[in-house]
């Protein structure tokens, strides 16, 4: 959806501009074309989902959800699951997401807020019972949390020491998440057709007004 705060964080973290993709505003074909155009000559494009994977319009429809966008762009999904305080119950939780995945787009799982010792136990158990790869975990880093306020996160430039914190977070995650495995998953993504003409959408204007509607 339309969001300006997340792109600011992306620019701060990886030093490149990111853009919004929204199947509600631009439809499936136009969204696919915009995705291909913005990807350019880069080897990989990373899409950050919003809300829950299947939460679309009104929170009750698939249209407009992160899953719908993945369908439109044929993007493999890495599902991040918050498992803090959970035991074996995380297996049926993941199984439920897989059963909803009619297009078989979920290709890997990352377990969030989990200890190294418990990960060593749960990873083989999950992979034994479910047809999915567990590609890593993120430890519960209590001293690292992004601040928030009404209507969302604070701006990245308002957070003291954000670059140092993100560097530390990156160093930690590269130890616990198999990035090479995620790259391999991305390399097997289906090929999309080349970009054709992108329809120019004029801004709406209120009746009798000369300025676009906001």
Where are these regions (language model features)?
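Phosphate-binding active sites in nucleotide-utilizing proteins
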Residues: 212-214
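ATP-dependent carboxylate-amine ligase catalytic core
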Residues: 1-73, 81-108, 116-121
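Short hydrophobic alpha-helical runs that function as membrane-insertion/retention elements
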Residues: 77-80, 135-137
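Internal gly/pro-rich beta-alpha loop/helix module
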Residues: 87-207
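Nucleotide phosphate-binding/pyrophosphate-handling subdomain across enzymes
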Residues: 43-44, 208-210
């Amino acid at each position: 959806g339309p969001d300006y705060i997340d792109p600011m964080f992306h620019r701060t973290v990886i030093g490149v501009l990111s853009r919004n993709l929204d199947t509600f505003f631009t439809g499936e074909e136009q969204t696919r074309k915009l995705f291909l155009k913005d990807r350019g000559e880069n080897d990989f494009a990373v899409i950050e989902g919003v809300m829950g994977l299947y939460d679309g319009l009104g929170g009750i429809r698939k249209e407009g959800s992160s899953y719908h966008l993945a369908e439109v762009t044929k993007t493999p999904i890495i599902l991040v699951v918050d498992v803090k305080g959970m035991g074996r119950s995380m297996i049926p939780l993941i199984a439920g997401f897989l059963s909803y995945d009619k297009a078989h787009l979920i290709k890997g799982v990352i377990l969030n807020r989990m200890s190294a010792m418990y990960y060593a136990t749960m990873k083989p158990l999950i992979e034994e019972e479910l047809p999915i790869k567990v590609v890593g975990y993120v430890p519960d880093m209590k001293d690292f949390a992004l601040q928030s306020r009404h209507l969302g996160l604070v701006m990245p430039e308002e957070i003291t020491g954000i670059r140092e914190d993100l560097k530390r977070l990156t160093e930690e995650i590269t130890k616990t998440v198999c990035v090479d495995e995620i790259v391999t998953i991305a390399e097997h993504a289906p090929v999309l057709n080349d970009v054709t003409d992108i329809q120019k959408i004029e801004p709406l204007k209120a009746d009798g007004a000369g300025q676009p509607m906001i």
